[in-house]
Amino acid sequence: SQPWEPKNYDGTFDGPMPLKRGLAKSKNMISIRVLEAIGPPFAQQWVSRFGFEAEKHPPFLTMALGAGAVTPLQMASGYGVFANGGYLVAPRLIERITDHRGRVLQDSPTQRPDESMRVIDARNAYVMTDLLQEVTRSGTAARAQGTLKRNDIYGKTGTTNDSLDAWFAGWHPS
């Protein structure tokens, strides 16, 4: 087997930089070093709090680069923790169903979070929101902010090896 040699998506190394800039520019070594500092087993314990299945995220440094299995709904739920001030709130796919006369057949009220749903402190959610806004302000998702002409987009881009797949997970307040 070959040794693991992580590289940045653009193949460049830009030297030391602050966490905020490294995350915005998708510099893989920044994320790897953060995970290395806290330890992959500790991170694996935490992923379930965000709605992910811990057993699908082996406790290795590759976790920092997204090696694991999540569904799009789990990803939306996980990022929702930051958008909801630190609470894990189940995503609402259908708000309301009405008939042709406008009568409500089914209504899905907004779930009001309580402390049992808290995943992280509100201050940490704020810090993460700030970091993820930088991705859309000056980082790898800056084009989306410019195209949509919105400055209230938060999220993170990602690519697989050889850029075969690319994604964006995030939100905007509504």
Where do the protein language model's features map onto the residues?
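A penicillin-recognizing enzyme superfamily signal
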Residues: 24-25, 69-174
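Active-site-adjacent helix/loop patches that line small-molecule binding or acyl-intermediate pockets
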Residues: 2-52, 57-84, 123, 131-134
